[in-house]
């Protein structure tokens, strides 16, 4: 028995063996590479638009790294980049998305600026806004969405001449707070990110996104 005023034992310091994740569940190898030598780091908190922020994005140019005050969103960045790349396929990973941003992506698809769009969202997104999950599937295709436990926000915009990778703190919604982004025409990183998503699309049943919470939890517990 513990003394009357003794602190309870810290479970983080217990002698039990730590949980081990089988590395074989990660199909895509880790990408290791040196820090890019060509980077443009800018404070874009005074930029008036996403188009202004990515004005120096070039196919053979440097990586753009910036901070915003939330004056433009991830969907604004995607739209501005598409104005440079021309029609392209889009892949998105986000913890959440606003209906207005989903509508913007649909407008880009209908206008031909997006040729294909696939969505990786957090499993809680399905419980929070199930109507948006159904709308994404209905608007972008039956195979357009997968779920996992994720907080990663990234996107790829690819066609025959551009392979743009976007890494950001932004979800696919309007958030008037300081946000960060890293954007560049980066074939190597695009291949890696696309490989991660392709593994998920190949291994997860397409209907899991609209399954019950217990079904999703059980599947993710087994398959990760």
Q: Model-predicted segments: where are they?
A:
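N-terminal localization/anchoring segments of enzymes in phospholipid and broader phosphate metabolism
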Residues: 1-88, 110-111, 158, 163, ...
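HKD (HxKxxxxD) catalytic microenvironment of the phospholipase D
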Residues: 3-6, 90, 142-197
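Extended interaction regions within the primary functional domain
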Residues: 34-41, 88, 110-118, 140-145, ...
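Generic detector of well-ordered alpha-helical segments enriched in charged/polar residues
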Residues: 51-55, 75-79, 106, 130-137, ...
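Conserved beta-strand termini and adjacent loop/short-helix elements that scaffold enzyme active sites
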Residues: 67, 120-122, 147-150
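Short beta->alpha linker loops
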Residues: 69-73, 96, 149-151, 188
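Primarily the HKD phosphodiesterase
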Residues: 72-140
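Amphipathic alpha-helical interface segments
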Residues: 184-224
């Amino acid at each position: 028995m513990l003394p009357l005023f003794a602190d309870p034992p810290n479970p983080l310091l217990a002698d039990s063996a730590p949980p081990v994740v089988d590395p074989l569940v990660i199909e895509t190898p880790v990408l290791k590479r040196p820090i890019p030598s060509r980077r443009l780091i800018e404070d874009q908190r005074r930029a008036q638009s996403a188009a202004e922020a990515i004005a120096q994005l070039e196919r053979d140019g440097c990586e753009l790294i910036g901070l915003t005050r939330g004056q433009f969103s991830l969907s604004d960045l995607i739209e501005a980049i598409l104005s440079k790349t021309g029609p392209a396929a889009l892949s998105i990973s986000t913890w959440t998305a606003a209906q207005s941003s989903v509508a913007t992506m649909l407008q880009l698809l209908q206008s031909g600026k997006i040729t294909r769009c696939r969505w990786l969202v957090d499993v809680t997104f399905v419980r929070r806004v199930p109507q948006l999950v159904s709308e994404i599937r209905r608007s972008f295709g039956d195979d357009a969405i997968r779920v996992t436990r994720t907080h990663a926000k990234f996107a790829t915009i690819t066609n025959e001449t551009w392979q743009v990778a976007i890494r950001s703190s932004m979800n696919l919604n309007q958030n008037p707070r300081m946000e960060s982004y890293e954007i560049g025409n980066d074939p190597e990183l695009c291949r890696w990110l696309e490989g991660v998503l392709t593994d998920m699309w190949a291994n997860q049943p397409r209907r899991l996104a609209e399954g019950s919470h217990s079904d999703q939890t059980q599947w993710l517990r087994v398959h990760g």
